[in-house]
A protein has these predicted regions:
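Bacterial N-terminal signal peptides that target proteins for export
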Residues: 1-10
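Hydrophobic helical h-region of N-terminal Sec-dependent signal peptides
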Residues: 10-18
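Hydrophobic small-molecule pocket/channel-lining residues, especially in calycin-type beta-barrels
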Residues: 23-185
Length: 185
């Protein structure tokens, strides 16, 4: 009798474990998959709008603005559930970013388009299709504001849009720019 009871208990445990594993692995219908931005991307200057007006408002010099609007850049993205690392390279240019995808605010001292990012908060949009990084910045003229960088995939994941929105405190309007990056195979 004891042997039969142990077999029955073992069978019950197995059923419970396998049922739990299948339930845990099943995708949750109310949480769509987040796009995977990992890969190597090349900036398409012709398809992009110029970042020059945005950089000018930030206070970037003429040489910086000219370089940014005419240089082909390559970016390598590595994404995990918690972190996105971006290594952007070009002739005489390197920018490494680490974005924490859990919505926390991260202190920073990063130079972005001529401004200094003081802190950054990165989170997925409500529909989990866009990654939004909000940088609290200080311009070269000492003005405060936000540089919002939104990244999302288009063209069946073969291209990425990087949209910039500059909101400076006490400025009546925002400045926008959009870059198109194509996946390298």
């Amino acid at each position: 009798m004891r042997y039969l009871l142990l077999r029955w208990l073992a069978a019950l445990v197995c059923v419970g474990v396998f049922s739990l594993a299948q339930t845990s692995a099943a995708p949750k219908p109310d949480q769509p998959d987040k796009p995977n931005l990992s890969g190597t991307w090349m900036l398409d200057l012709k398809a992009s709008t110029s970042v020059e007006p945005l950089m000018k408002q930030i206070g970037a010099g003429l040489l910086e603005r000219t370089y940014a609007t005419s240089t082909k850049l390559k970016a390598t993205f590595h994404q995990t559930e918690q972190v996105l690392t971006i290594a952007t390279r070009g002739p005489s240019f390197a920018l490494d970013e680490t974005l924490y995808l859990d919505g926390r605010t991260d202190p920073s001292n990063q130079q972005l388009l001529g401004a200094t990012a003081l802190k950054t908060r990165t989170a997925w949009s409500e529909d989990h299709k866009q990654l939004v990084a909000t940088h609290q910045i200080k311009t070269k003229q000492g003005k405060g504001g936000q540089l919002i960088i939104t990244r999302y995939l288009i063209n069946e994941g073969k291209s990425m849009v990087v949209a910039f929105t500059l909101k400076l405190n006490a400025e009546p309007s925002n400045t926008f720019a959009r870059q198109i990056w194509n996946m390298q195979t």
